Amino acid sequence: SQHEIEDILTIGKEMIEKPIELLDGVEEVLQKLKKNYTLIVATKGDLLDQERKLEKSGLLQYFHHIEVMSEKKEADYQKLIRHLDIQPRELLMVGNSLKSDILPVLKIGASAIHVPFHTTWAHEEVSKKDAHESTFKTVHSITDILRFL
C-alpha cells in the first residue's frame, strides 16, 4: 500500500541520515598507519552507500583505495591482491569478522588481526575449531594493533 511504501522510504532516509559513530582511536590509528602503509578499505555492501559512509565519517582521506565486494571469500581477496599488484604476505587485514575478514585472508597467505566487536551478525559466526586452527592476533581495541606494526 501507499502507506507501507512511505514507511519504507522514511526508514531508509533515517538510516542514510544516521550519524556515523567511530570507534575510539580509529582516526588516531589511521593517521599513524598512513605514514608508513598503503591503507585499503575492503568491505561488503553497496558501493555508493559504503563511499557515502566513508565520506561522512571523515576517514576517506586516509585510504588509497576502496574495494567493495559482493562477497569476502578467498577468491575475492585473491582478486584484490591481483588488482593491487601485491603479494599475499604484503597484506595485513584488520577486521571484526572471523568468517569474512580473518579466515579467508589467512587461507591465501596474508596476515590478519581480529578486533572483535560487541555484536556479530549470526551469519558471520564461525566454529571454535575453525578459529583455533588459524593463527592470527586478537586485540581488544583498534589502538592495540599499533603494538604489532
Model regions and ranges:
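A metal-dependent, Asp-based hydrolase signature
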Residues: S1-E14
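Short alpha-helical segments used as structural interaction elements across diverse proteins
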Residues: T10, V41, L47-Q50
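Small side chains
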Residues: G12, A42, A110-A112
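Asp-based, Mg2+/Mn2+-dependent phosphohydrolase catalytic module
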Residues: Q31, D46-L149
